[in-house]
């Protein structure tokens, strides 16, 4: 290779296209097309994703409360002690 970047050796049967940094736009249509597309995708996948998170949250909170309850001593077992 031995050449500087941008003037690399030519390869046969390889077509490459380039665009000047002055001709390209960094974020074209981000606000006009990008954000509405994100909102549309969230709205479409809401009912596929949210129920699973709700079920996971309910199971997690139940398990945490049950674990904390099982760590406590039962006061009824010690009523006859002096």
Swiss-Prot record:
* GO cellular component: a single term: mitochondrion
Name the UniProt key words of this record, in alphabetical order.
Answer: Acetylation, Disease variant, Electron transport, Membrane, Mitochondrion, Mitochondrion inner membrane, Phosphoprotein, Primary mitochondrial disease, Respiratory chain, Transmembrane, Transmembrane helix, Transport
Q: Matching Gene3D superfamilies, A to Z? A: Cytochrome b-c1 complex subunit 8 (1.20.5.210)
Which family does the record assign?
Answer: Belongs to the UQCRQ/QCR8 family.
What disease association does UniProt give?
Mitochondrial complex III deficiency, nuclear type 4: A disorder of the mitochondrial respiratory chain resulting in a highly variable phenotype depending on which tissues are affected. Clinical features include mitochondrial encephalopathy, psychomotor retardation, ataxia, severe failure to thrive, liver dysfunction, renal tubulopathy, muscle weakness and exercise intolerance.
Q: How does it assemble?
A: Component of the ubiquinol-cytochrome c oxidoreductase (cytochrome b-c1 complex, complex III, CIII), a multisubunit enzyme composed of 11 subunits. The complex is composed of 3 respiratory subunits cytochrome b, cytochrome c1 and Rieske protein UQCRFS1, 2 core protein subunits UQCRC1/QCR1 and UQCRC2/QCR2, and 6 low-molecular weight protein subunits UQCRH/QCR6, UQCRB/QCR7, UQCRQ/QCR8, UQCR10/QCR9, UQCR11/QCR10 and subunit 9, the cleavage product of Rieske protein UQCRFS1.
Protein's UniProt name? Cytochrome b-c1 complex subunit 8
The organism encoding this protein is Homo sapiens (Human)
This protein's gene is called UQCRQ
């Amino acid at each position: 290779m031995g050449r500087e970047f941008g003037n690399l050796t030519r390869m046969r049967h390889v077509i490459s296209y380039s665009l000047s940094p002055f001709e390209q736009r960094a974020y074209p249509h981000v606000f006009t097309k990008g954000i509405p597309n994100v909102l549309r995708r969230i709205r479409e996948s809401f009912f596929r994703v949210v129920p699973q998170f709700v079920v996971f949250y309910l199971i997690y909170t139940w398990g945490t409360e049950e674990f904390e309850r099982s760590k406590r001593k039962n006061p009824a077992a010690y009523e006859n002690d002096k």
